[in-house]
Regions:
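Conformationally flexible catalytic loops at phosphate/diphosphate-handling active centers
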Residues: 2-3, 132-135, 139-194
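Phosphate/pyrophosphate-binding active-site segments
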Residues: 1-2, 121-124, 278-372, 478-480, ...
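Glycine-rich, acidic loop regions that bind phosphate or pyrophosphate groups
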Residues: 90, 100-136, 227-334, 434-435, ...
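N-terminal cofactor/phosphate-binding cores enriched in small/glycine residues
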Residues: 3-73, 79-88
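A short, small-residue-rich loop immediately preceding and capping a beta-strand
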Residues: 21-24, 45-47, 65-102, 259-267, ...
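Active-site diphosphate/adenylate-binding microenvironment
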Residues: 8-19, 26-30, 34-39, 332-412, ...
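Glycine-rich, anion-gripping cofactor-binding loops and their flanking helix/strand elements
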Residues: 64, 75-76, 82, 202-288, ...
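Thiamine diphosphate
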Residues: 40, 100, 107-113, 379-541
Length: 541
């Protein structure tokens, strides 16, 4: 019989799946349900030992014997402190030892990977436990072997309740490249060819990669390709980019029909919340993440496989291994995406960004701050030879202007920096440094505060709280821009913007950088945006 505590059940199932079969068990009240459960798993060989220090070194010896991992289980707190010496020895000898502790304490040892599992009260808690355990056990043998530490929060009651079977759990596997000498990857390719509904989603990538034409022809029609502008040109063909309007225009039945069976991802952050909700609500059977560092990026709570290699090398390697038949799935996505009309907005932040993007000169760089600037750019087609950069890895307004100026200072292109008023106000000290040249163009979107706060579904902000929630203000950038040597332009309507754009996108500015400040109304911006999405749900076209 096993405990009913789901973090322990997840751990037991994943220890078995990751071939951790030798476990040294130390007595203790807090780890009682854990010890009883592990001792009852028939696939485990368990060794009782009272002294934690001795138990740790005993586990080290077990792991040294045949090179397979061994585990030591004890209470947290003082008992875990006794294991510092064995952790140090295992780390230096690169031996796979799993330290498992249970208690209220969140003490973590300095191992290759240390995680704390919460008590499971919701499905989200259980999903988190599953991912953390997988990450820790994968790290036992990743860029060298070594110890890991898994700490469980275990609270009373400690009774062993009658759970007769371990649960079926998600097991994340890692392939280190696609070399037959490192790991047999044939089952991976067999699974790839088994699925007909295959999708590739590309996250943020600060580069341009041009695929050989032979690979483009082999790959493009085999997958539905989805990317945001911050993914740049890193796809063998033209991806679907109008993902937010497209998903909004789909009803529930259509979304269910269009979800992928196999999802492959590469690159960094994905900004679209609608895309994330779609893939979490309709999860793929398998999610493969391809990255050179082999990290477990579980963006959609569906990760099953990590392939540790350059994503472009991966795609070019599988190109000749994919069955030659062309599935209908990519064509369905492409046709559906083309059915959504091009977005058109009256005067607003969206229309300003659209006008600037359509006016970008060849071989320029578009540097977007986090959040709204990135989302709104997705409504428009960025020219193919324009590189897109954004500080959206962690989120937040801090440092976006300084990072963009740093990039522009060593770039020979015209650099168009798009950011909101709060991002500008947070980072305006960077303008005093003068570590930039005449190739800087700043599009400042000023709607008197944080527009994104008005966009939250169901949120009503009363007048008294408005300055605190949205950072509302009445400032403009004219004096600061001119003091710092910028040409200052401003627009409060479409006609004024059109008169400013030729100078804003020109190289001939007398050796000066340029700020274009566009004034809009936050409430109107959001109403225009919401009206657009309402129309997509109830189309009149």
């Amino acid at each position: 019989m096993y405990t009913d505590k789901r973090n322990i059940l997840q751990l037991a199932s994943l220890l078995k799946a990751h071939n951790v079969r030798k476990i040294v068990l130390c007595p203790g009240i807090r780890n009682l349900p854990l010890t009883q459960t592990l001792a009852n798993v028939p696939e485990f060989t368990c060794y009782p030992m009272t002294d934690e220090r001795s138990a740790g070194f005993f586990a080290l010896g077990l792991a040294l014997h045949d090179g397979t991992p061994a585990a030591i289980c004890c209470e947290s707190g003082a008992a875990t402190q006794c294991l510092h010496a064995v952790v140090s020895e295992a780390y230096r000898q690169k031996v796979q030892v799993v330290i498992i502790s249970a208690g209220k304490d969140r003490l973590l040892l300095p191992t290759k990977k240390s995680v704390t599992l919460p008590e499971v009260k919701t499905e989200e808690d259980e999903q988190l436990c599953n991912r953390l355990i997988n990450e820790a056990l994968l790290e036992l043998n990743h860029h060298g072997k070594g110890p890991v530490h898994i700490n469980l929060c275990v609270n009373e009651p400690f009774l062993l309740l009658p759970v007769s079977d371990l649960p079926e759990v998600r097991v994340i596997r890692r392939y280190r490249g696609l070399s037959i000498y490192d790991q047999d990857y044939k089952p991976l390719i067999e699974r790839l060819n088994r699925y007909q509904r295959r999708m590739v989603v590309v996250g943020q990538m600060n580069l341009i990669y041009l695929f050989d034409k032979r690979y483009t022809k082999l790959l493009y029609k085999q997958f539905a390709w989805i990317a945001e502008n911050i993914g740049n040109r890193t796809i063998p063909g033209q991806p679907i980019k109008n993902i937010d309007p497209l998903l909004t225009s789909m009803n529930r039945e259509e979304q269910e029909k269009m979800h992928p069976d196999l999802l492959i991802t590469y690159g960094g952050r994905i900004v679209s919340d609608r895309l994330k909700r779609f893939l979490m609500k309709h999860p793929p059977t398998e999610h493969w993440h391809i990255s050179p560092d082999g990290e477990a990026e579980d963006t959609f709570d569906a990760l099953t496989t990590i392939v540790e290699m350059d994503p472009f090398e991966f795609l070019e390697k599988i190109a000749n291994m994919i069955d030659s038949r062309t599935p209908d799935y990519p064509r369905q996505w492409e046709t559906r995406a083309k059915s959504v009309p091009q977005a058109e907005f009256k005067w607003s932040e969206m229309s300003v960004i659209g006008n600037v993007i359509s006016s970008l000169p060849p071989a320029s760089t578009l540097l977007m701050a986090n959040g709204s600037a990135v989302r709104y750019s997705q409504f428009f087609d960025v020219p193919k030879d324009v590189e897109v950069i954004s500080c959206c890895g962690t989120g937040g307004a801090d440092g976006t202007l300084a990072a963009a100026l740093g990039y522009a200072s060593v770039s020979t292109n015209l650099n168009f920096i798009v950011l909101g008023d709060l991002s500008f106000l947070c980072g305006m000290n960077a303008l005093w440094s003068k570590n930039y040249g005449s190739n800087v163009r700043i599009l400042l979107l000023n709607n008197g505060g944080g527009e994104i706060f008005h966009a939250q579904p169901g949120l009503t902000i009363d007048e008294g709280a408005l300055p605190y929630v949205t950072g509302s203000h009445t400032r403009n950038a004219k004096s600061l821009a001119e003091d710092c040597g910028f040409i200052y332009l401003s627009a409060s309507n479409e006609a004024e913007l059109q008169s400013c754009l030729p100078q804003f996108v020109s190289m001939a500015t007398g050796g000066k950088p340029v700020v274009l400040e566009a004034f809009t109304d936050a409430t109107e911006d959001i109403e225009i945006l919401k009206s657009y999405f309402r129309e997509l749900k109830n189309p009149i076209y």
